[in-house]
């Protein structure tokens, strides 16, 4: 074994205490059932993990973090230690069976973590158990007694509260049989539990959804199991984390997306989002007077609006008017564009009389442009979250969601939309999204991924053929918590943007794409309109 890295190498103790000489057994390793209730937890400091684990890792127990190569196991183990030192003032021990201490320090620096400074201050100790590059042979019975004693001594010397071991797979690769290694790992976890340290132990698996660990025994010596995955969906990889078990305590079930940023692991606990945000009765303008009238006075301040329609129906024009109105009212606005460049957006907006560049110069508008294929959905979500938290807008827009849906599963896309809408509602931001439908004319699904239930207001834009000419139709299809115009209005796109006209009179089946002319009794129609107006006046609308 190589030398350990720290202020000074802990010497192997010359005598063992009675406690150390007592061999652990499965009976005294298992806690009494009464002790399993209300187990205290230690926070990891990893963003989102406390949400899905209901508070962190069980105090004084061992957690197995399993995953295929490149899933972030070593990062999880090191971030657990680093956050413990920096955020909670808890010294830690990192036991490495694979990488050298120098490599670990160098890799951590890419996240801005100065491990050498922590080592110099005696807050972190790296115990090097990596194989000797010269190679060696082991004869006789294998046991981890020497390593266990070194770890115990380091825990006492540095008053460590956290231990990370990376990775136990290396032990199986060096020694056999597996049953003997399992026995020694059981001894190790028992000693760590006696020392009352919270431990993260990593192991490798061969398949994303196969056995938990490569050798099939590692999970039985730990109290808790966390699985990291890096799944190939289409042409993109998607990272997820799943807590398989936290013995004796509760946690959230299922997989949750995460990404690796410059700050380390960032988990999106979508299932942990609470519907506790306040609901505002304040209205904000869409930037189009007629559309505000159709929506009963405008959109609700904290609502999510979805404009859906075929290409060329004016969705980006609606977004531009929405953002212009916010900037004119002195509100900060942010646009995430995934189909057009900044120059193209500015040029198109100027044709409608909107100067986006001037709003940017005033600091009222920020435009983020990116190709959907440039990153995975989790990375896009993290980018949106980072930009919104830094810029703190009152309005945000995404143009378009359908571009982000290319090449990903419906479940991943839906989770992305939930993440964005949840963030917008949490920050009381008015969100405006666009969605491009595949069908050029006629009835169609509003959204293929069934995200319509997540949004508060849906504006349906559609092409219709009337008397041999192409026209455009607009309908406020849905608006939660408010009266809205049910009519199907004709609209034009001119130099002033979208201009909404009256309803299509004398036609039915507009939405189906097969408009049919009907005879209208003008006298009865006028009487009906007067009655509707009187009814609205009586209701105070």
From Swiss-Prot:
Which residues make up the binding site for ATP 2? Answer: 311-316, 352, 472, 478-480, 482, 484, 486
For this protein, the activity regulation entry reads: The interaction with KaiA enhances its phosphorylation status, while the interaction with KaiB decreases it.
CDD domains, alphabetized: KaiC-N, KaiC_C
* Basic and acidic residues compositional bias, start-end: 26-35
Maturation and modification: Phosphorylated on serine and threonine residues by autocatalysis. Has a 4 step phosphorylation cycle; the autokinase acts first on Thr-453, then Ser-452. When Ser-452 is modified KaiC switches to an autophosphatase mode, acting first on phospho-Thr-453 then phospho-Ser-452.
Give me the comment on cofactor binding.
Answer: Binds 2 Mg(2+) ions per subunit, one in each domain. Mg(2+) is required for hexamerization and phosphatase activity.
The record lists ATP 1 as bound by 70-75, 110, 245-247, 249, 251, 261
Q: Which residues cross the membrane?
A: none
Q: Where is this region: Disordered?
A: 1-40
Name the domain of life this protein comes from: Bacteria
User: What positions does the entry give for Mg(2+) 1 binding?
Assistant: 74
Question: Which positions are annotated as binding Mg(2+) 2?
Answer: 316, 339
Which residue positions does Phosphoserine occur at? 452
Write the record's keywords in alphabetical order, separated by commas: ATP-binding, Biological rhythms, Hydrolase, Kinase, Magnesium, Metal-binding, Nucleotide-binding, Phosphoprotein, Repeat, Serine/threonine-protein kinase, Transcription, Transcription regulation, Transferase
List, separated by semicolons, the cofactors it needs. Mg(2+)
GO BP terms in the entry: circadian rhythm; regulation of circadian rhythm; regulation of DNA-templated transcription
Report the sequence similarity comment from the record.
Belongs to the KaiC family.
Function, as annotated, reads: Central component of the KaiABC oscillator complex, which constitutes the main circadian regulator in cyanobacteria. Complex composition changes during the circadian cycle to control KaiC phosphorylation. KaiA stimulates KaiC autophosphorylation, while KaiB sequesters KaiA, leading to KaiC autodephosphorylation. Clock output pathways impact the RpaA transcriptional regulator. KaiC enhances the autophosphorylation activity of SasA, which then transfers its phosphate group to RpaA to activate it. KaiB and KaiC together enhance the phospho-RpaA dephosphatase activity of CikA. Has a weak, temperature-independent ATPase activity; ATPase activity defines the circadian period. The phosphorylation state of KaiC modulates its ATPase activity and effects KaiB binding.
Q: What is this protein called?
A: Circadian clock oscillator protein KaiC
Q: Which organism is it from?
A: Parathermosynechococcus lividus
